[in-house]
From Swiss-Prot:
This is Large ribosomal subunit protein uL14c. Pfam families: Ribosomal_L14. The keyword Signal does not apply. GO terms for cellular component: chloroplast; mitochondrial large ribosomal subunit.
Length: 121
């Protein structure tokens, strides 16, 4: 569950290292799950990269440390909360995605993120 003020690691090579969620998009939602879009502010960034500290960005949640239950009864949980920074068309701004992503990303039609990911769980 990703609430406003939650810190997430960035799982791509855009230059941002950590973002803080400031809004979960989609109506009057209190928290975000895997596959949801959030608005975040960059809190840590690598120098001389396209995304700078204090930039406001859109991101897709790809990993959460909260256990989620799948339709087949299996439970899955990750070690961290992570997101991939996207543009307004929901295409990733980076060219690489680090770490595994959940299968729910594919179900929500973020196929470009899935194709860049090294592993889909």
């Amino acid at each position: 569950m990703i609430y406003p003020q939650t810190m997430l690691t960035v799982a791509d090579n855009t230059g941002a290292k950590k973002i803080m969620c400031i809004r979960v998009l989609g109506g009057n939602r209190k928290y975000g799950k895997i596959g949801d879009t959030i608005i975040g502010v960059v809190k840590e960034a690598i120098p001389n990269m396209p995304i700078k500290k204090s930039d406001v960005v859109r991101a897709i949640i790809v990993r959460t440390s909260k256990t989620i239950r799948r339709a087949d009864g299996m439970y899955i949980r990750f070690d961290d909360n992570a997101a991939v920074i996207v543009n307004m068309e929901n295409n990733p701004r980076g060219t690489r995605v680090f770490g595994p992503v959940a299968r729910e990303i594919r179900d929500k039609n973020f196929s470009k993120i899935v194709s860049l990911a090294p592993e889909v769980l």
